[in-house]
């Protein structure tokens, strides 16, 4: 709803064109036509990506795993790593509950446990998990009676994002009253369970969302999801060779892990095999943070980055 925000989107469009993306700046009328459930009062314009969409996370993950196996990879499930010990020649012994694996290279892609796995090699990786909440609504006639799926909508003013979820809606928030999670470390026993809902934290964001998307007032809430994901202090992933350790690589703090995973994996593979990635990924280089960084600094900057997501 401000000229500054629109100017930012115009600058983003220029960046997208440089990268070969055909995004467009559109006005309120076009926004309303594409997303009839959006209240465009006070909206000056938006940035539209006609190729935007979403994938099934489970199916995509299994497709990656199948492709890896076809290329000769072996995947060991439920096999915790206990130690990572360097040898004088730069190779590594990875000690697991099922024995020790001798590896020329190792990659820390441990997600929520990246800090703990890094500590096994004496490395501090500056990242921190944050709690994040989103809502899934009951079925909505205005959604499932459409001939085509609703587009994703990101509302910077309301600090929210919305997309169609089957016959209802999914709406998530980057609230100001946010909380770091697992300050003392991610429990090894943490699995796929969710965290307790903290609806009071997102009450202001929900109230704004009901004005931006009035249809939500008539929609029942089917599920409230609260789960953790990781951020680096500047919001970018930590990718590449870890300074001071031979053949130890990082692919962590990938906040949008599912959507960024393919690009991070490709860049890291090129780096390991060819000696450098084919694209400039300086903004993701794990080496951009020096020895000066501390857990306290990381935690505060991660909170700030979450609050400024939009």
What kind of feature is each model-predicted range?
Residues 47-105, 113:
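Helical element adjacent to the flavin cofactor pocket in flavoenzyme catalytic cores
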Residues 4, 37-43, 85-93, 231-235, ...:
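A short, glycine/Asx- and small/polar-enriched loop/turn
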Residues 27-28, 77-79, 223:
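Short loop/edge segments at beta-strand edges and connector loops
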Residues 157, 166, 188-310:
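C-terminal catalytic lobe of FAD-dependent flavoproteins
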Residues 67-70, 120, 271-275:
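Active-site catalytic microenvironments for nucleophilic, acid-base chemistry
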Residues 1-8, 47-70, 76, 193-203, ...:
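Short beta-strand to alpha-helix junction loop
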Residues 1-34, 157-161, 166-168:
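Dinucleotide-binding Rossmann-like beta1-alpha1 core, especially the glycine-rich loop
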Residues 83-196, 204-212, 291-310:
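Flavin-dependent oxidoreductases
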């Amino acid at each position: 709803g401000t000229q500054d925000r629109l100017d930012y989107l115009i600058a983003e469009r220029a960046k997208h064109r440089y990268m070969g993306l055909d995004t467009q700046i559109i006005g309120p009328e076009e926004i309303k036509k594409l997303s009839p459930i959006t209240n465009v009062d006070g909206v000056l314009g938006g940035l539209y990506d006609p190729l935007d969409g979403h994938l099934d996370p489970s199916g995509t993950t299994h497709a990656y795993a199948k492709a890896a196996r076809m290329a000769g990879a072996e995947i060991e499930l439920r096999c915790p790593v206990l130690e990572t010990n360097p040898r004088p020649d730069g190779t590594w012994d990875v000690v697991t509950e099922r024995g020790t694996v001798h590896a020329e290279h190792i990659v820390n892609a441990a997600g929520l446990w990246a800090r703990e796995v890094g500590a096994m090699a004496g490395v501090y990786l500056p990242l921190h998990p944050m709690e994040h909440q989103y809502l899934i609504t009951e079925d909505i006639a205005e959604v499932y009676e459409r001939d085509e799926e609703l587009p994703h909508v990101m509302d910077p003013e309301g600090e929210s994002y919305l997309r169609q979820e089957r016959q209802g809606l999914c709406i998530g928030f980057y609230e100001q009253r946010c909380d770091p999670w697992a300050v003392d470390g991610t429990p090894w026993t943490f699995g796929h369970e969710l965290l307790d809902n903290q609806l009071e934290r997102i009450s202001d964001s929900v109230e704004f969302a009901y004005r931006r998307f009035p249809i939500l007032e008539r929609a029942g809430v089917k599920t409230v999801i609260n789960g953790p994901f990781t951020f680096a202090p500047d919001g970018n992933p930590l990718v590449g060779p870890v300074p001071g350790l031979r053949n130890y690589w990082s692919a962590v703090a990938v906040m949008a892990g599912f959507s960024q995973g393919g690009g991070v994996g490709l860049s890291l593979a090129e780096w390991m095999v060819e000696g450098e990635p084919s694209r400039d990924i300086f903004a993701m280089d794990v080496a951009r943070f020096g020895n000066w960084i501390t857990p306290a600094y990381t935690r505060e900057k991660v909170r700030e980055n979450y609050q400024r997501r939009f």
